Amino acid sequence: MKISAVIFDLNGTILEDEDEYGRAFNQVLKSLGVETSAEPPQIKGIGVKENWPHLIKKYDIKTNKSLEQLAHETQEAYLTEINNVTVRSGFDEFVENLKDSGIQIALATSNTWEIAEKVLNKVGLGVIFDAVTTVEEVAYGKPDPGLFTLTADKLGAEREKCLVIEDSASGISAAQLAGMKVVAISGRDEDEQILASADLIVENFSEITAKVVEEL
């Protein structure tokens, strides 16, 4: 079946920013008295706010701060890192190839619009998408399929004709629950087992073309 739309995740998929978010989380953890390793402590594919219950439990954190406040502090720390954020190799060429083939492109992110807009504008991708959906627009984040089904509705695209490009297990699950094909972007060797249920796994956008997408 011919794919009519490609829906991209943002953080860790279009953007190589796992380490930048890791430093942001670690900065807030340090302010709470937690010393962590240099490794990013967050769970990929879920929102910043949604990460904090996991981190509070993992590090047995005692704090009066709300999840909203912890998320706000994390996002503020991330914004100090956005000069270091880069676009994944091959993305611009892949998008141009999709557009030349008449395939719509959209963004579905677990992030907020405020943060997504700032980082997209910073890396020069602020106006390329036919539709954008952020976590504020749905009742539940990934792995719930709502982000992707709403995005398909915005595009006027049939769900089974949509392809999602993701970098996390929760994102892959969400796309599959939405009835969509999935390409997984694997940034680290250890990710491939986690991403194994995807229809295709690649390391960067240089490995895929509109022709590959249409044949999935």
Role assignments for model-derived ranges:
Residues 3-92, 96-101:
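N-terminal helical cap/lid subdomain that shapes the substrate entry/recognition surface
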Residues 35, 104, 181:
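Residue-level detector of anion-binding/catalytic polar loops
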Residues 106-107, 184:
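Hydrophobic beta-strand core positions in alpha/beta domains
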Residues 41-42, 60, 81, 106, ...:
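Short, flexible active-site loop motifs that bind/organize anionic cofactors or intermediates
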Residues 13, 109-111:
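Conserved phosphate-coupling serine/threonine residues in phosphotransfer and NTP-handling enzymes
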